[in-house]
Amino acid sequence: MKLPIYLDYSATTPVDPRVAEKMMQFLTMDGTFGNPASRSHRFGWQAEEAVDIARNQIAELVGADPREIVFTSGATESDNLAIKGAANFYQKKGKHIITSKTEHKAVLDTCRQLEREGFEVTYLAPQSNGIIDLKELEAAMRDDTILVSIMHVNNEIGVVQDIATIGEMCRARGIIYHVDATQSVGKLPIDLSQLKVDLMSFSGHKIYGPKGIGALYVRRKPRIRIEAQIHGGGHERGMRSGTLPVHQIVGMGEAYRIAKEEMESEMARLRTLRNRLWNGVKDMEEVYLNGDLEQGAPNILNVSFNYVEGESLIMALKDLAVSSGSACTSASLEPSYVLRALGMTDELAHSSIRFSLGRFTTEEEIDYAIDLIRKSIGRLRELSPLWEMFKQGVDLNSIEWSHH
């Protein structure tokens, strides 16, 4: 077993060797290096064919028509294109948007930008388990609501929203529904031929494909229109200009093909490992599960260890690659906004760790992690005056701390 152990698959995944091998064939002179938009020679035709195959592989995983898949530079761009693109196109109908407080920053900051441009955004607070209350969502819908953006799987706590029901609610009112499916695609079944979802964002690098490539699903029936955010040669049916990066697209296609084949067995395996990890730590004192095991993605476990500083815990667990919060916001020392939105105290949010498992995680690694966590928590709590006071029965919430 090699240390450190990678348990941060929700931040990124290693590229599957099968994917890397495939990508190598689309880079050099002796490979297929042409521009898929070059229509006048074989180099272009071969590149275009490779892109078509990948587009099909992505569409097949999610039950879409390949013509509904638009390539982007990643899920952040897909979120921007979906939300700004739909808001700008449909603003004559209304300027009200609904999202949730626990969305990814790529959705929240895009909505904030639209607010600066004169749109009105309602940010729903989830219930304490992270699930959106559908009655609250319904109450927030108005005649001038044009767009709802609620994610499938939360990247920090792994809870799964009921996108099927939300889609029905939106379709009944003629509201466009966007789903950020970055953390769910290839892990949970998605069938866009059944779901009433109009726009869906995908990433390559969360599912063993390369970084820097993603896609946006744009429904054809009923037809959804979006305004392009990047202008140029009119690639991707005018929705996203720019020369297509064939090697990245082929890599994403291969990753999605593998995911379709292996998803069922892989998810059962990961669910077992995640439960093994939780069962290994849940009997410790003052340990809390954030999110919901029943309504949770099989590969994410977010746990708070009370009376232990999250930063010191991460240092103590240096042999485990884990995160507090998400990689996108872990550079700031603020407690996770997702956990705060669940109504958690700053202290508890600060002591939370996200473990995310993946294709190369083994049972041996999980057992090593459990042992390390138990030892580290014990040691850090011995050093903690707060833990000592708590053990003596002092109510820490009632103490007036002096601010120096």
From Swiss-Prot:
Subcellular location: Cytoplasm
GO cellular component terms listed in the entry, alphabetical order: L-cysteine desulfurase complex
GO molecular function: 2 iron, 2 sulfur cluster binding; cysteine desulfurase activity; metal ion binding; pyridoxal phosphate binding
Enzyme Commission number(s): 2.8.1.7
Record InterPro entries: Aminotrans_V_dom (IPR000192), Aminotrans_V_PyrdxlP_BS (IPR020578), Cys_deSase_IscS (IPR010240), Cysteine_dSase (IPR016454), PyrdxlP-dep_Trfase (IPR015424), PyrdxlP-dep_Trfase_major (IPR015421), PyrdxlP-dep_Trfase_small (IPR015422)
Keyword Nucleotide-binding: no
Residues modified as N6-(pyridoxal phosphate)lysine: 206
Alphabetically ordered keywords of this record: 2Fe-2S, Cytoplasm, Iron, Iron-sulfur, Metal-binding, Pyridoxal phosphate, Transferase
The keyword Cytoplasm belongs to this UniProt entry's keyword annotation: yes
Enzyme class: transferase
Residues at which [2Fe-2S] cluster binds: 328
Known cofactor(s): pyridoxal 5'-phosphate
Reaction(s) catalysed by this chain's protein: (sulfur carrier)-H + L-cysteine = (sulfur carrier)-SH + L-alanine
A GO BP entry: [2Fe-2S] cluster assembly
Pathway: Cofactor biosynthesis; iron-sulfur cluster biosynthesis
PROSITE patterns in alphabetical order: AA_TRANSFER_CLASS_5 (PS00595)
Catalytic residues as annotated in Swiss-Prot or TrEMBL: 328
Function (record text): Master enzyme that delivers sulfur to a number of partners involved in Fe-S cluster assembly, tRNA modification or cofactor biosynthesis. Catalyzes the removal of elemental sulfur atoms from cysteine to produce alanine. Functions as a sulfur delivery protein for Fe-S cluster synthesis onto IscU, an Fe-S scaffold assembly protein, as well as other S acceptor proteins.
Alphabetical list of NCBIfam families matching this protein: IscS (TIGR02006), PRK02948.1 (NF002806), PRK14012.1 (NF010611)
Subunit (UniProt): Homodimer. Forms a heterotetramer with IscU, interacts with other sulfur acceptors.
Sequence similarity: Belongs to the class-V pyridoxal-phosphate-dependent aminotransferase family. NifS/IscS subfamily.
Protein name per its UniProtKB record: Cysteine desulfurase IscS
Gene: iscS
